[in-house]
């Protein structure tokens, strides 16, 4: 039992002990935060040291591997890597300890708040006794003064009336003084009771606080001690390895690995030449240029070769099968006639046929002339069904360094299917060109309304009536899919719009052939499993899912096929790279808005965004080869403007205890990130970079002030005509920094049997869908009237009046964001090579 020091030492004349104890309790919370900061700083130092040791291990692995000293570098490398792992393990333990400290800080704050409410009565008692004490002193002083004055007047012989008045004053002062004495006694009793309880409570809080702090410090010291023990074990292992690495063992390893053989050259004795055998007309047998050494014909298995012949062959100083070797056993000795001329042997045609290419069953022999049968077939057209073709790269790999001239043949991917070969290849323009060419007209906006999937478009090349004929773009053949990550408006804010949650989930492994490499930071669908469903109940309201808008406006998830041999992503990373690893980040935001009339207060806005990181393919080798790659950590700046942040729980960790609301700290789960990138590389090994969805967020909107383009719609409907006016105004304050709105398109449905349309500026009317379309150039503060303008149209009707409908607007912007959110790397080991920001419309509608 601890002595109640607080109860005995915090009284005093001024009764200020309560304030000292209360502020001491608050200082405990400050101490907890400072301890957390200290441990975090120690973890940062250990992490930096671990990264330095890892670099040192890589340096040791890059040293010369030649000579007898080469195996020693392996010992250095293994020991250094283990030391780096020990320090990284300490970092992990310290990070867990920081979480425990932060949890205690939160609990401590709650307990302090509860204690403050409990000691409120003690604070009142302190105020009461302090005020009563001051009043008592004043009353006592007044009583003394009045009494002395009465006594002075009596001595001076004052009048009786004055003495009576002085007596009354003394009497009142006496009564007041006595009453304050009684009040002080009551206040003192209550104060002592309250203060006793409070002092004991404060001491209990401090005892618990110090015990918790001691537990944290004990865990901290235990983690450091365990690390030191591990470091000692690694050091002892290093010493043992060096002791075992003796001079003899190093020389033995070199002899085993680089030795050239144990057989010494044998003696050679002089042998006389056998002239009788050498002059019998034996013909030397020479090897053909491409003959295989040591290969002999075994035609007569029953016959045995003479050992004498072998001795003669050996006496020539050349092994069997060597160039210039004389085969006396199979020597061709010509027959001579009477005059000394050679007799030409008769050639049997049947024997020639039997030994021909088609009928010979004999084994191949280098001594016999070889016939080749060449059959030239006519060139066949490529029908796309041959699966045994190989690429130029495979030919180069199989025949070595033989140079091949370029060929116009079709290059085929290794795992390309027959269907893919049979289909005609559609040329894909670069990403920027696709963005610029993705307008409504080039993509057949006025085709029949699709009732099926939103990704289907009419394939007919016949243009519908009452519409200018425009050549179809390449992307109209295969329309791009609807972006999976496009945010929706919140449920309940817009009638008919529903939204399903889109949590992060592990990436799906595709069974099909890997897709072509995506452009940097392009949202590759094979790396995302996010899904969402959105519907709009109003049938006359144009939406993003209508056939007019599917694939017409640019999205940020389109693929871009990179030609072979080109690279448009981050630079490749090599294992010997000692510099910071390059990564890229993209912020993609979507603004959804609904304007109702000219009242700004009725505008409903929802802004959502995604953050994506892009990693070069070379970084995967570094992650997988390193036992503890550098932890990627970053700060999310201007986070106070975000209403909600949803990080990828599988890949990202965050510190929820941060006091700074404008900055959020995050760090990657490196094993999970390495596993994800490795799986992505297995799916698409040809890609030079891989995109990873990091987090999603929702921006705090400020009504119409958060919309980049303000809209007001006016309808004037009569039986014969309908007048329409759409006022728009560019709002640069909604963007950071202000950027032009590109590819602005306005779609308005008009019913009532439109016979004729007059518009300013010119619009396109689709009689089949009863919709008018305006296509505007870029809108910015440098445009005419600083980005403000009007769209006017007059429609002549046959079945009027028209019913005012909801219009839809779409646009996008590059190089700017609506939230102002930014990202900053923390720590070392990585560098930001690209920071891309962009936003586009989701459901951007206006009504009268």
Swiss-Prot record:
Gene: fcho2
Family recorded in the similarity comment: Belongs to the FCHO family.
Cellular component, GO annotation: clathrin-coated pit; clathrin-coated vesicle; cytoplasm; plasma membrane; presynapse
GO annotation, biological process: chordate embryonic development; clathrin coat assembly; clathrin-dependent endocytosis; convergent extension involved in axis elongation; membrane invagination; protein localization to plasma membrane; synaptic vesicle endocytosis
Self-association and partners: Homodimer.
A GO molecular function held by the record: phosphatidylinositol-4,5-bisphosphate binding
Entry function: May function in an early step of clathrin-mediated endocytosis.
Disulfide bridge map: none
Protein name: F-BAR domain only protein 2
Positions of the UniProt region annotated as Disordered: 292-316, 404-526
Domain F-BAR span(s) in chain numbering: 4-250
Residues the record lists as Phosphoserine modifications: 405, 417
Pfam families (UniProt xref): GMIP-like_FCH, muHD
SUPFAM superfamilies linked: BAR/IMD domain-like (SSF103657), Second domain of Mu2 adaptin subunit (ap50) of ap2 adaptor (SSF49447)
Location in the cell: Membrane, Clathrin-coated pit
Record membrane topology: Peripheral membrane protein
Compositionally biased residues, Low complexity: 445-460
Keywords tagged on the record: Coated pit, Coiled coil, Endocytosis, Membrane, Phosphoprotein
SMART domains named among the record's database cross-references: FCH
Highest taxon of source: Eukaryota
Coiled-coil intervals: 87-114
Keyword presence, Phosphoprotein: yes
Domain MHD: 580-848
């Amino acid at each position: 039992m601890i002595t109640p020091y607080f109860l005995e030492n915090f009284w005093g004349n001024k009764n200020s002990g309560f304030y000292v104890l209360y502020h001491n309790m608050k200082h405990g919370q400050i101490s907890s935060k400072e301890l957390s900061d200290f441990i975090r700083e120690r973890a940062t130092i250990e992490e930096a040291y671990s990264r330095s040791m890892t670099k040192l291990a890589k340096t040791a692995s890059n040293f010369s591997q030649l000579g007898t000293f080469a195996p020693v570098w392996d010992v250095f490398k293994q020991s250094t890597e283990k030391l780096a792992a020990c320090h990284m393990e300490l970092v992990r333990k310290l990070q867990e300890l920081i979480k425990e400290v932060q949890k205690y800080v939160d609990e401590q704050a709650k307990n302090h708040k509860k204690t403050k409410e409990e000691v409120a009565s003690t604070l009142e008692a302190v105020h009461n006794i302090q005020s009563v004490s001051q009043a008592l002193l004043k009353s006592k002083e007044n009583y003394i003064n009045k009494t002395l004055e009465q006594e002075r007047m009596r001595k001076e012989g004052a009048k009786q009336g004055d003495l009576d008045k002085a007596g009354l004053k003394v009497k009142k002062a006496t009564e007041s003084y006595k009453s304050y004495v009684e009040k002080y006694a009551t206040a003192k009793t209550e104060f002592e009771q309250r203060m006793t309880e409070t002092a004991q409570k404060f001491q209990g809080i401090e005892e618990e606080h110090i015990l918790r702090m001691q537990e944290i410090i004990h865990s901290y010291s235990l983690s450091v001690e365990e690390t030191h023990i591990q470091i000692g074990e690694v050091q002892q292992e290093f010493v043992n390895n060096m002791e075992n690495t003796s001079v003899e063992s190093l020389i033995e390893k070199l002899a085993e690995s680089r030795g050239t053989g144990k057989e010494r050259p044998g003696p050679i004795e002089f042998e006389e030449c056998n002239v009788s055998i050498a002059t019998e007309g034996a013909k030397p047998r020479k090897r053909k240029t491409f003959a295989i050494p040591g290969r002999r014909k075994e035609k007569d298995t029953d016959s045995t070769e003479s050992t004498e012949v072998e001795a003669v062959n050996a006496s020539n100083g050349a092994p069997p099968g060597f160039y210039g070797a004389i085969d006396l056993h199979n020597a061709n000795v010509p027959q001579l006639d009477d005059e000394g001329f050679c007799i030409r042997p008769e050639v049997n045609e049947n024997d020639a046929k039997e030994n021909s290419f088609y009928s010979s069953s004999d084994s191949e022999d280098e001594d016999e002339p070889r016939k080749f049968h060449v059959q030239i077939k006519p060139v066949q057209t490529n029908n796309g069904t041959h699966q045994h073709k190989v690429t130029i790269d495979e030919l180069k790999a199989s025949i070595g360094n033989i140079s091949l001239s370029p060929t116009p043949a079709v290059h085929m991917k290794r795992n390309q299917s027959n269907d893919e070969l049979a289909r005609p290849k559609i040329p894909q323009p670069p990403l920027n060109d696709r963005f610029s060419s993705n307008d409504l007209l080039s993509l057949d906006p006025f085709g029949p309304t699709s009732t099926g999937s939103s990704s289907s478009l009419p394939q007919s090349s016949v243009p519908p009536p009452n519409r200018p004929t425009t050549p179809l773009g390449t992307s109209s053949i295969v329309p791009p899919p609807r972006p999976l990550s496009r945010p929706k408006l919140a449920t309940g804010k817009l009638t008919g719009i529903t939204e399903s949650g889109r949590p992060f989930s592990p990436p799906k492994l595709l069974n099909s052939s890997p897709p072509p490499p995506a452009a940097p930071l392009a949202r590759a669908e094979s790396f995302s499993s996010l899904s969402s469903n959105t519907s709009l109940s109003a049938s006359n309201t144009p939406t993003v899912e209508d056939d007019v808008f599917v694939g017409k406006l640019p999205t940020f998830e389109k693929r871009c096929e990179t030609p072979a041999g080109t690279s448009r992503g981050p630079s490749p990373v090599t294992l010997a790279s000692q510099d910071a690893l390059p990564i890229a980040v993209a912020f993609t935001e979507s603004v959804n808005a609904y304007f109702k009339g000219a009242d700004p207060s009725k505008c409903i806005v929802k802004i959502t965004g995604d953050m994506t990181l892009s990693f070069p393919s070379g970084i995967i080798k570094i992650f997988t080869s390193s036992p503890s790659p550098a932890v990627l950590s970053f700060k999310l700046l201007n986070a106070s403007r975000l209403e909600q942040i949803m990080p990828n729980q599988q890949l990202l960790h965050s510190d929820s205890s941060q006091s700074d609301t404008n900055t959020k700290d995050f760090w990657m789960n490196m094993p999970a990130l390495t596993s994800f990138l490795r799986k992505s590389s297995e799916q698409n090994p040809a890609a030079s970079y891989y995109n990873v969805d990091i987090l999603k967020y929702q921006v705090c909107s400020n009504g119409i002030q958060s919309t980049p383009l303000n809209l007001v719609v006016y309808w004037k409907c009569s039986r014969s005509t309908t007048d329409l006016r759409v006022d728009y105004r560019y709002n640069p304050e909604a963007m950071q920094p202000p950027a032009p709105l590109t590819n602005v398109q306005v779609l308005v449905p008009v019913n009532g049997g439109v016979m004729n349309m007059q518009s300013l500026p010119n619009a396109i009317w689709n009689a089949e869908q009863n919709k008018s379309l305006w296509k505007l150039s870029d809108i910015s503060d440098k445009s005419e009237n600083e980005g403000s303008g009007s769209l006017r149209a007059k429609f002549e009707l046959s079945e009027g009046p028209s019913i005012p409908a909801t219009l839809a607007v779409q646009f996008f912007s590059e190089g700017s964001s609506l939230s102002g959110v930014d990202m900053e790397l923390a720590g070392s080991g990585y560098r930001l090579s690209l920071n891309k920001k962009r936003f586009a419309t989701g459901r951007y509608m206006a009504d009268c």
